[in-house]
């Protein structure tokens, strides 16, 4: 949902004129690299190249926004952690109270902000989130194979910043 609906919609709301297909086609090399390396930081040079050359976002915007996004913008990590913890609780027939669910959201959000932009840092943070609500941290073994992506939001924000600063149409 976030990848294919929210970010393209966000671009439209802020008036960025990059078509849906052009956005994903232009960003696909960075997305594939992000998926294979599992690291926003490792993907940064390719993301910058894709956003500058394929999406035509000025370098001034991408050189400022993308490095910050690679280290701070961990929305994928936050969503992944919250969904993974709730999935693991349901898988193990653990009923979570509303307070526990709110605690999961709060802890996942804070943990994602503090997560390093290195491969699989989110898994370590996931153990902390699981432990914070009294669940077994070793349950991460079930979700280990599906850990990944934040690059798309970094590119979308870069285009929005360039548009708001009147650097692009």
PLM regions: where:
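Membrane-embedded translocation segments of transport machinery
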Residues: 1-73
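Residue-level preference for alpha-helix termini and adjacent loops
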Residues: 22, 26, 31-34, 43, ...
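Transmembrane alpha-helical segments and their short flanking loops
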Residues: 82-169
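Alpha-helical transmembrane segments of multipass membrane proteins
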Residues: 2-6, 73-76, 80, 111, ...
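Transmembrane alpha-helix interface/packing and boundary motifs in multi-pass membrane proteins
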Residues: 29-38, 69-75, 89-91, 106-118
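Generic detector of bulky aromatic hydrophobic side chains
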Residues: 4, 8, 13, 70, ...
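Membrane-helix boundary/coupling elements in multi-pass transport proteins
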Residues: 35-50, 57-60, 76-82, 115-122, ...
């Amino acid at each position: 949902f976030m990848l294919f609906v929210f970010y393209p919609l966000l671009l439209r709301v802020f008036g960025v004129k990059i078509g849906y297909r052009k956005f994903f086609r232009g960003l696909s090399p960075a997305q594939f690299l992000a998926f294979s390396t599992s690291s926003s930081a490792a993907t940064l040079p390719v993301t910058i190249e894709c956003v500058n050359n394929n999406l035509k976002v000025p370098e001034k915007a991408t050189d400022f926004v993308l490095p910050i996004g690679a280290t701070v913008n961990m929305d994928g990590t936050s969503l992944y952690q919250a969904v993974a913890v709730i999935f693991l609780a349901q898988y193990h027939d653990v009923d979570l109270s509303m307070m526990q669910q709110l605690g999961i959201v709060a802890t996942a959000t804070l943990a994602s902000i503090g997560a390093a932009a290195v491969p699989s840092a989110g898994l370590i943070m996931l153990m902390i989130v699981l432990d914070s609500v009294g669940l077994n941290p070793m349950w991460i073994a079930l979700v280990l194979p599906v850990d990944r992506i934040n690059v798309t939001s970094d590119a979308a924000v870069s285009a929005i910043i360039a548009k708001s600063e009147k650097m692009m149409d």
